[in-house]
From Swiss-Prot:
Family: Belongs to the MurCDEF family.
Organism annotation: Staphylococcus haemolyticus (strain JCSC1435)
Domain of life: Bacteria
Uppermost EC category: ligase
EC number: 6.3.2.9
Protein's recorded name: UDP-N-acetylmuramoylalanine--D-glutamate ligase
A Gene Ontology term for the protein's cellular component: cytoplasm
Lineage, highest ranks first: Bacteria, Bacillati, Bacillota, Bacilli, Bacillales
Length: 449
């Protein structure tokens, strides 16, 4: 951790506890600050609040009294606290310094940063970069919106390691000095307008990621959204990714991922499915190359990376059949997305809690479905759907039985996909439990194990 003295003996008000507020408060104590934590909820039984009180932190809960601003503290804002909260608005009116927890992580670390933001794909891209580092001899530590508090991870990261930080628009809003060496914008679409009010405000929040970059830094973005990048404010070297054409950066040509004219890998050898994931993969490969990850480690990652748990997660191959766990698909929209991700014939495992809906909206996405293995309360509805489309329908009692029956109908090169399009509660407590049962059954029933 950098020996940062800018907060020593300063009054600091942390607004919002949760995980990031808790870690920020502990860090601020280490940095010699006089710390108060304020949260609108009752924290009288909160173990984190009790821990902080034992360290000398003052806790003010149950509201946001404006009197907390009377001693003109520096504000550290939890990303979950909107800027519209009265105490933050008043702090702006009084021209008080407001830091975000991510900004704090930057101030106390000399580690180079790969920062990833975007409306979609940022978690997959961040995780894939982390896996590429793991496959090499380099160290990259995941942090930020992906679930590891940035200010905590930053303390553990040395200058010769990378911080790989996923950033939401909420975290980027408060950027002042934050400067990643490599910044990625996966894409920008309309989202979180309840928070940002306008699309322009949301886009501007995302653009904060390159606000402080210099000509020694890199910005990686989607070539087909390059019009969203403001060139007049951009100093970093801009590189692009595209699945459709050659660009200055990384692209797909003749079925290969290509960087600077060099073929890296055939896309048929990737285990992460879907056109959307091709863009995530390109961004991750380019960032990892720029950070010095060897091509061999990148290829190793691309041929083994299973994705995010229960979200089109690759769980293994038996003979020529790849198996994917998409248990998080608890509605038809998510399953449409999954069915559209494969060009190969699909053995589709589906069914679950009956909420009274039919599934006809899935019909346009079923062209590659060869077999349906149906279970749960919606078994008969899915059987009727499959029969109406001329699919082979097999009935199973549960996930375990479904995996067993797959063995009787699967053909070479079929993809086996669990994407239930239903909640799990008829048979399993959570979609995670359902997905784990699928993985366990795959391992238990298949001869390769």
């Amino acid at each position: 951790m950098l020996n940062y003295t800018g907060l020593e003996n300063k009054d600091v008000l942390v607004v919002g506890l949760a995980k990031s507020g808790y870690e920020a408060a502990k860090l601020l104590i280490k940095l010699g600050a006089n710390v108060t934590v304020n949260d609108g909820k009752d924290l009288s039984q909160d173990p984190h609040a009790k821990d902080l009180e034992a360290l000398g932190v003052k806790i003010v809960d149950g509201g946001h009294p404006l009197s907390l601003l009377d001693n003109e503290p520096i504000i550290v804002k939890n990303p979950g606290i909107p800027y519209t909260v009265s105490i933050i608005q008043e702090a702006y009116q009084r021209h008080l310094k407001i830091l975000t927890e991510v900004e704090l992580s930057y101030l106390i670390s000399e580690a180079p940063i790969i920062a990833i933001t975007g409306t979609n794909g940022k978690t997959t891209t961040s995780s894939l970069i982390g896996d590429m580092f793991k496959k090499s001899r380099l160290t990259g530590r995941l942090s930020g919106n992906i679930g590891y508090v940035a200010s905590k991870v930053a303390q553990e990261t040395s200058p010769n390691e990378y911080l790989i930080t996923e950033l939401s628009s909420f975290q980027l809003l408060g950027v002042e000095q934050y400067r990643p060496h490599i910044a990625i914008i996966t894409n920008i679409y309309s989202a979180h307008l309840d928070y940002h009010e306008t699309l322009e405000n949301y886009q501007n929040a995302k653009k904060q990621i390159y606000k402080n970059q210099t000509e020694n830094d890199y910005l990686i973005c989607n070539y087909h959204q390059r019009h969203l990048i403001e060139s007049e404010n951009l100093k970093a070297k801009t590189l692009y990714f595209s699945t459709q054409q050659e660009v200055d950066g990384i692209y797909i040509k003749d079925g290969f991922i290509v960087y600077q004219g060099i073929r890296i890998i055939n896309i048929d050898d990737l285990v992460l499915p879907g056109e959307h994931n091709l863009e995530n993969i390109l961004a991750a490969v380019l960032a990892s190359i720029l950070a010095g990850v060897p091509i061999k480690a990148i290829i190793d990652s691309l041929t083994t990376f299973s994705g995010i748990d229960h979200r089109l997660q690759y769980i293994g191959t038996n003979r020529t059949n790849k198996y994917y766990n998409d248990s998080k698909a608890t509605n038809t929209l998510a399953t449409q997305f999954a069915l559209n991700s494969f060009k190969q014939p699909i053995v589709w495992l589906c069914g679950g809690l009956d909420r009274g809906n039919d599934f006809d909206e899935l019909i346009p996405y079923m062209k590659n479905v060869r077999v349906m293995v149906v279970f749960g309360q919606t078994q008969e509805k899915f059987a009727k759907l499959g029969n109406s489309q001329g699919k082979l329908v097999v009935k199973a009692t549960d996930i375990e039985d479904a995996v067993k029956k797959v063995q009787d109908v699967v053909e070479p090169n079929d993809v086996v996909l669990l994407s239930p399009a239903c909640a799990s509660w008829d048979q399993y407590k959570t979609f995670e439990e359902r997905g784990e049962r699928f993985i366990e059954s795959f391992r238990a029933h298949l001869p390769s194990y």
